[in-house]
């Protein structure tokens, strides 16, 4: 334990580590959460050419939007949808531009495009919510089921796979609970979902020198001759890397949740994620989805840390270690679109390469003839990969120290 604390202190004493942790915090929390809520994400529009032209009044806009959504009764029915659309059109006709910003028009417009494509007027430059006849918006849940079936057919998900997904979807409670959706859509679609991709960069920078740095700092001889030996020190380094990963995640996650609670409160936590994407099959509400996404980031980060430490133990050069570590995450992302679909899904199992937003999709894996919904594997396989890399990191460190 003493060795762990020594390694832990040594890592945190490095000025470069403190600088990069601060940069990560500024990017993910200050810009990615606080300023996104207050300014360029939800601030009222002043300059429609750029989100950075928004006013610094996101808190007020969010609270007004939540209050407005509550006026529609809480349950999403045909009548609710008709009332939402009718109210929007009335405000637009009255020239109430500022009032329109507190509506869920982007979300509702996506519902209309998905469920009522025959009502789309291609000659009209306006969005559907501006011109569609509210009286024709009927059969919301029947149409949703039809669209889901058609999507599965087009995706080639038929037979046993289709029935498997339907079994999951049947657990979704209907009618949907409705409150303000846009905030949760942004939170789950980008704020939390993109956290892992950013963490990968900073974890790669900090952890790449954990083992390789001993040669760079000319301390390898000292490590070799210490009474503790390479084995205990290697274990202490791995525990230090894991601790740093969890600490960085906790710093970002706790700060983001505090920011979220300040701006959004807990309103809408029990809405189904189908309010964001109608054809999602997961029986999850917004809070459950957020917990899943944070678990995805944490477990993926631990898995990635294991890979980085293995590379650091196997490679003496800090820069090469960093490049190889970053290539593990960003390489597959760059080439994925050029690969067959099944290979893309396989690459998603690499730590932090996949996306927590798979809970909105219908992806599955077939393993030993058994169908498994992709989100289950996306939070288990990456961390297992990282854990498996750790013993190899110790062995690799051993060979190099003995050499």
Could you say what each language-model-derived stretch is?
Residues 18, 231, 318-320:
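Residues that define the loop-to-transmembrane-helix transition and helix capping
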Residues 21-25, 319-332, 350-351:
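Central hydrophobic cores of alpha-helical transmembrane segments
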Residues 343-364:
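Short hydrophobic, aromatic-rich alpha-helical segments embedded in or entering the lipid bilayer
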Residues 224-230:
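Short helix-to-coil transition segments within interhelical loops
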Residues 26-83, 133-214, 235-314, 318, ...:
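Secretory targeting signals
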Residues 5-7, 11, 310-314, 381-403:
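Junction motif at the cytosolic side of a transmembrane helix
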Residues 217-221:
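Hydrophobic transmembrane alpha-helix segments characteristic of membrane transport
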Residues 1-20:
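Aromatic- and glycine-rich beta-strand/loop motifs that create alpha-glucan
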């Amino acid at each position: 334990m003493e060795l762990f604390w020594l390694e832990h202190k040594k890592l945190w004493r490095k000025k470069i580590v403190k600088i990069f942790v601060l940069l990560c915090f500024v990017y993910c929390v200050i810009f990615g959460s606080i300023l996104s809520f207050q300014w360029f994400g939800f601030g009222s529009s002043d300059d429609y050419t750029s989100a950075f032209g928004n006013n610094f009044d996101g808190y007020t806009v969010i609270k007004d939007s939540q209050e407005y959504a509550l006026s529609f009764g809480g349950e999403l029915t045909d009548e609710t949808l008709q009332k939402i659309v009718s109210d929007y059109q009335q405000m637009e006709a009255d020239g109430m531009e500022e009032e329109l910003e507190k509506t869920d028009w982007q979300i509702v417009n996506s519902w209309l495009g998905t469920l009522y494509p025959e009502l789309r007027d291609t000659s009209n430059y306006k969005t559907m919510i501006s011109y569609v006849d509210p009286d024709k918006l009927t059969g919301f849940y029947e149409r949703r089921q039809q669209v889901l079936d058609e999507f599965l057919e087009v995706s080639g998900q038929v037979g046993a796979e289709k029935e498997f997904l339907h079994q999951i979807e049947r657990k979704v409670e209907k009618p949907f609970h409705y409150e303000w959706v846009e905030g949760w859509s942004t939170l789950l679609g980008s704020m939390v979902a993109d956290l892992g991709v950013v963490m990968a960069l900073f974890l790669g920078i900090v952890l790449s020198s954990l083992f390789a740095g001993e040669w760079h700092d000319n301390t390898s001889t000292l490590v070799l001759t210490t009474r503790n030996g390479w084995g205990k020190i290697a274990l202490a380094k791995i525990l230090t890397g894991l601790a740093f990963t969890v600490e960085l995640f906790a710093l970002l996650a706790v700060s983001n949740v505090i920011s979220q609670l300040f701006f959004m409160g807990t309103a809408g936590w029990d809405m189904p994620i189908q309010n964001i994407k109608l054809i999602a099959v997961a029986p999850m509400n917004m809070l459950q989805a957020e917990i899943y996404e944070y678990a995805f980031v944490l477990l993926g980060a631990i898995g990635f840390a294991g890979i980085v430490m293995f590379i650091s133990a196997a490679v003496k050069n800090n820069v090469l270690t960093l490049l190889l570590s970053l290539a593990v995450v960003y390489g597959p992302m760059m080439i994925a679109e050029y690969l067959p679909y099944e290979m893309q899904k396989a690459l998603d199992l690499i730590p932090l390469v996949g996306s927590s937003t798979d809970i909105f999709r219908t992806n599955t894996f077939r393993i030993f003839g058994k169908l498994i919904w992709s989100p289950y594997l996306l939070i288990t396989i990456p961390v297992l990969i990282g854990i498996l890399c750790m013993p190899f990191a110790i062995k690799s460190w051993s060979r190099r120290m003995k050499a």
